[in-house]
Amino acid sequence: MFYHGGTFISLLENPMRRLASLLTLSLFPLLGGCSSTPAAKPVVVPQPKSAFINQTPSRSPVYSQGVSKGDFANRTNVDRFVQKMVEKHGFDSAQLHQVLAQAERYDWIIRLMDAQAPTTAKPTGPTGAWNRYRAKFITPDNVQNGVNFWREYASELNRAEQIYGVPPEIIVGIIGVETRWGRVMGKTRILDALATLAFDYPRRAEFFTSELEAFLVMTRDEGMDPTEPKGSYAGAMGYGQFMPSSFQRYAVDFDGNGHTNLWDPVDAIGSVANYFKAHGWEKGQPVAVRGQGQLPGYEHGFQTRYPVASLRRAGLTPTSSLGNHSEASLLRLDVGTGYQYWYGLPNFYAITRYNHSTHYAMAVWQLGLAVKAAR
């Protein structure tokens, strides 16, 4: 659902967070991911509580006049994109050209994207990969920051659970892994990131062109200056690092102020919960269960599916209830001295819709549980 490209985000494995999708587009503000909302008008966004960051772009679009040069000015592929935006969304051609002419192309964004390309290399034995990954997120300081966030927004987290059926620890875990509860939301202008990848990164041009489209629509509809929003180098926005397309589909105005703002923690809480509900979260069901035994010859990963009975016959037994599930994916975690095997259940799979990675989903879940236990 989200594409991750910031300082903290780049720690995660498969680009989904990095590409699995991430934030929203609008007419002119290239920045976060919001779904289309009513007409643009000045928005008053509540200030964040306590020390939690609330990067709120200005709500009145301001477009420079007469911009005729820049990294993306007078480009054929840009002209085609503008024409599409005019015909499909009713944008003004001259004004949109002016906005895109203010976008800057960055080679470092392309280099970082190339560095996140999937690798086919497989380790020959246990190396402790899961231990290293987990240690990036589940630390005493990070857990305490999560406790503080939960306390600050307890009522909003509880309301999200009541409406969407997603428990607070999952929402807290996602926001913690994505941005450390708003502390690391990215410093790259979304317009620059998406324009660079849409117009000068052929390998993923189709995907990022659609994200740029969504971003511009989002900024127009939310009354934002498209040159102001900042996020990850891949265009992910706000506390939950939504891509613009995810904004369009899943972002909600959870504080009821008439605007959907992913840089506001309350809207982010509701949007993350809505995302999980839309991706099949099962209220009251377990996420994953540790298995007792070893299955070295079995294919593993969150996309596998096995009857629980067949896993039992092969020598793996669950250490706690699997809820009402008779099938599960087989997860394997490299802990250095060997491998842990887990039963992945539908709620675990739902977390991987946010980022297609077993490590990512396990870190989100275990961080949320650690914060819950420390409250």
Annotate each PLM feature.
Residues 37-152, 158-161:
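An acidic, Gly/Ser/Thr/Pro-rich helix-cap/linker signature
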Residues 11-23:
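Bacterial N-terminal signal peptides that target proteins for export
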Residues 333-375:
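C-terminal functional modules
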Residues 222, 226-336:
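Flexible, glycine-rich surface segments
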Residues 82-91, 101-108, 162-165, 176-183, ...:
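Sec-exported extracytoplasmic/periplasmic mature domains
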Residues 125-271:
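Acidic/His-rich structured neighborhood in mature extracellular/periplasmic domains
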Residues 30-33:
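C-terminal motif of bacterial Sec signal peptides marking the signal peptidase cleavage site
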Residues 2-3, 8, 28, 52:
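Aromatic (phenylalanine/tyrosine) cluster motif
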